[in-house]
Design a protein with these regions (language model features):
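Short amphipathic, positively biased membrane-proximal segments
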Residues: 1-57, 65-66, 79-81, 145-155, ...
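Short beta-edge strand/loop motif at the mouth of beta-sheet-based domains
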Residues: 49, 75-131, 203
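Beta-strand cores of secreted/periplasmic/IMS beta-sandwich domains, seen most often
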Residues: 57-62, 66-69, 73, 180
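Hydrophobic pocket/interface hotspot
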Residues: 67-70, 123, 156-158, 192
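Short, solvent-exposed secondary-structure boundary/capping segments
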Residues: 130-137, 154
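Short, solvent-exposed aromatic-acidic interface loops
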Residues: 137-138, 159-165
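A conserved amphipathic terminal alpha-helix motif
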Residues: 166, 170-205
């Protein structure tokens, strides 16, 4: 038993070291510049000393005003998450157009993350079309920052900050997010870009 356990332990230790040295830094900063990673963003003050602090970014050939409506309508039972719909939107295809009736999101509203609305993230603050912060103070925040570039494009920066509660049952979900969040977020940013740039449209009827 001991002879079989040792190789498994060594393999697990090696994998953990490789992830900590290479995988985690990459996934926590995908697409973002060092300056974007280190700069303060709205909502940072709501979660101090986060265990998980991820800043990702993408350049979109559209203005903040053109991108903002796509962010206002996200959520399960709304426009979806523009990510892997089979996983985060009950298999329903995320919207490929702006939905007028979903443009009234405001601080105090909840962005739904489950079909029954019991799971969701509150909108904490909003500065259209520059920034929006979701989350629960002291636990987790999700910030969207839109910075206009001189050429008419936008740097869309997203930051997720959370503190792991190691002795809580929620730690299982936190660790799941640790390893899967990058793939969902990357897909969402790429699909947001394509929609805002007009590369994704509704099929002809």
């Amino acid at each position: 038993m001991r002879s079989r356990a040792l190789p498994t332990l060594l393999a697990a230790s090696t994998a953990a070291i490789v992830y900590a040295r290479y995988g985690r830094p990459w996934q926590l900063t995908w697409g973002a510049t060092p300056a974007e990673v280190s700069r303060p963003l709205p909502g940072d003050e709501l979660v101090t000393r986060p265990t998980f602090n991820a800043t990702r970014a993408i350049t979109i050939a559209a203005t903040p005003q053109e991108i903002w409506p796509w962010l206002l309508q996200v959520g399960v039972t709304r426009a979806g998450w523009y990510s892997y719909d089979i996983l985060d939107n009950l298999g329903r295809r995320s919207a490929r157009h702006i939905i007028a009736e979903l443009q009234n999101l405001a601080p105090g509203d909840v962005v739904p993350m489950s079909p029954n609305g019991k799971a969701g993230t509150p909108v904490l603050s909003m500065d259209p079309p520059a920034s929006m912060v979701w989350g629960t103070p002291g636990e987790s925040t999700w910030t969207w920052q839109l910075d206009a570039n001189p050429d008419g494009s936008t740097r869309l920066i997203t930051r997720v900050r959370s503190r792991y509660r190691w002795l809580s049952p929620s730690i299982a979900m936190s660790l799941l997010v640790e390893f899967t969040d990058i793939w969902m977020m990357r897909k969402m940013l790429l699909n947001l870009r394509d929609r805002a740039e007009g590369l994704v449209t509704e099929p002809a009827r």
